[in-house]
């Protein structure tokens, strides 16, 4: 019997689809941001307990990207299986900072490293200045139970 692998809470895996490649069947760099979004939403869903979006009293919180940076350090081709690890840098405010590491599953070669920064807004485009207590507690609990998802960004900034 084969033991099944349990993925860390900050990891997703997927294969490069043909539609995501150029004529040489190498993935197009623009797909990296779509994959980062998938990793970010998967991490948020696990962090706040099964919800893909954060809500405050039934009102959704939006987190538009305000800054992004990517270093393309390798490449992947059609059919390659990739691993995306998403990390978060805890903040004193409601600003969200995510870091990403995209690697090939077969050999662990790094394909891309990146970061995105986000502000948090509520209905009407108003800034959210403080996490609701319930959301803040879920985040603290998640960070203490999953220290591997937390970063200070140093391992990423050096290569960006």
Where are these regions (language model features)?
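Terminal targeting signals and extreme-terminal segments of soluble enzymes
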Residues: 1-81, 89-160
